[in-house]
Amino acid sequence: NSTMNSLLQLGR
């Protein structure tokens, strides 16, 4: 799911 991936990336 790319939406989840985007959020995880922001939290990197």
Curated annotation (Swiss-Prot):
Tissue distribution: Nacreous layer of shell.
Protein's name in the database: Uncharacterized protein IMPP10
Species this chain originates from: Nautilus macromphalus (Bellybutton nautilus)
